[in-house]
Amino acid sequence: MSIIKTIKRHLPVARLRRSSQPANGTYDCRALPDSLASVGLSSRAGGILMTFVPPEADFQRVSQAWQRFNSADLTVLTLSSNGALSSSRSQSTYCDGNGPEGSYLWLPDTLIARHETHIVDLHVADTQTASQRITAIQQELARLQVRMPLSADRTFAMIYCDGLSASEGFLMQAWYNSGRFPCLAIGGSAGGKITFDGTWIGTGGRVLQGKAVIVFCQMAPGKSFAPFKSQNFTPRDQSWLIAEADPVARTVTSVFNRQGQQQSFVAALCEHLNCNEAQLSERLKGLTFGVKVGE
C-alpha cells in the first residue's frame, strides 16, 4: 500500500487542512503526489517544503513533480540524497537507500513566519585553488540582497550545497569572512549514488548543479530554535599530521609519522592497518576520515 493511501485512510483531508504543525512523511517515486492534499497538506499550505529524492530515482522527474507546488507562500526545495529519514515510518527512521522511497519535511509559516531564498554560484569550474574559490564565493555573498533583518535569536540560515562541488568548507569560510550574516547556519549537502554520477538541488522550478541554496528563516512570534548536533562516527586513537594535500580535490598525498618523517599516506595507512596496498580498500570498509575541530 502506498504512503498516499495510508495517509488518506488515517488522516482525513478535512482534518489535514486545519493542521498548522510541522509534518513529515515518505512518498513513492513510482507514484508521485498529484496534489499537496495527497500527502496530507493543505492546498493553501505556506512555509517551506523540503523533499529528499533517493539516489536511484529520476531526479529531474521527481523534482518537477514536487516543484509544481511552488507558490508565493510555499517554497519547495528538492534535494538528491543518499538515503532519507522520516519519523513517520513504523519500522525504522531510515528509508531504503536503494529503493523508490523518498521523504519530505514541511515547515509551516506558523513556525517559520518569513523566509527568503537565494542561490549562490560555487565557482567550481572557474577556480583552481582554495583561496580563489573562497574569494569568488565571498563576492557572490556580498551581492546577496537580503531583505529580512537578521539576528542570532530570531533568524537562521538553511544552506544546502551541491555535494559533488566539494565546496561546503569554502562556502562557510566565505560566509564567516563576509561578516554579513549574524545568524546560525545549518544545513548540509545534496547527496547521490556512490558512483558520484551527480548531485542536484531543485528550487524555483529549476535543477541546479555547482550551486548552493540559502534559505534565511525568521521564527514566528512565540517560537524559538536551538541547534542539534550529532555525529555518525566514533573517533579512533590514530591520527596523522598532514604534509601534502589538495583542499580543492580533497585528497591527501603524504603525512608525517611519529618520528616526524614524511611518508606516503597510502603507506601510512597500510602500516597502521597491517596490510599491503592491494588489501587497503577492503581494510578501510567501515572507516572514514575526519578533521577534529573545536566544540
Indicate residue ranges for each PLM-predicted region.
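Small-residue-enriched flexible segments
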Residues: 2-47, 53-59, 65-69, 74, ...
